[in-house]
Regions:
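Short acidic, gly/pro-rich beta-turn/loop elements at beta-sheet edges
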Residues: 34, 46, 106
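Conserved C-terminal guanine-recognition region of P-loop GTPase G domains, centered on the G4
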Residues: 27-30, 53-138
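Flexible beta-alpha connector loops of hexameric P-loop NTPases
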Residues: 39-48, 117-122
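Well-ordered mid-protein domain cores that form the structural environment of catalytic cofactors
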Residues: 19-21, 35-36, 49-55, 64
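Short, flexible loop segments at the rims of nucleotide/cofactor-binding pockets, characterized by
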Residues: 13, 41-47, 71-75
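Flexible glycine-/small-residue-rich
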Residues: 37-40, 98
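Conserved G1/Walker A P-loop phosphate-binding module
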Residues: 1-38
Length: 139
């Protein structure tokens, strides 16, 4: 939704939003691309097993995978599992994106007017980015 600057898919503070594959076409200046939104992982073991099969079916169709990781999330074992067992086995490019930087601790220091992190947040964002780089480095 942030990418499209509006509510394109349902969002909930409690429940997962995307349950099936959703595709959106972006067009402009004589070019177009299709963005494929897949359900996120880590909701439950049953859902992860279902999504693993879905990912295996869909990933070969994709040219690039953007794998989103929240800046304030330290529980990355499910992401690591999908990276090692599904994503890394494919032939598409994978780009890990650290999101929701404004929630990085100390979150009360985020500069809302300037839309930028405090020096302490900036350091934590840098460390998070480096940790993601190390964890998801190709073997």
């Amino acid at each position: 939704n942030a990418l499209f600057q509006g509510e394109v898919t349902p969002v909930s503070d409690v429940h997962a939003g995307t349950r099936e594959v959703q595709r959106f076409r972006l067009s402009g200046h004589g070019h177009s691309m299709v963005i494929t939104d897949l359900p996120g992982v880590g909701e439950s073991r049953d859902r992860d097993a279902e999504y693993e099969a879905l990912y295996r079916d869909i990933l070969p169709e994709l040219d690039l995978v953007l794998w989103l990781i929240k800046a304030d999330d330290r529980a990355l074992s499910v992401d690591e599992y999908f990276w090692r067992h599904i994503l890394q086995c494919g032939h598409q490019q994978v780009l890990f994106v650290v999101t929701q930087a404004d929630k990085t601790e100390p979150c009360h220091e985020w500069d809302m007017a300037g839309i930028q992190p405090s020096p302490a947040q900036e350091q934590n964002i840098r460390e998070k980015t480096e940790a993601v780089f190390r964890l998801f480095r190709p073997v």
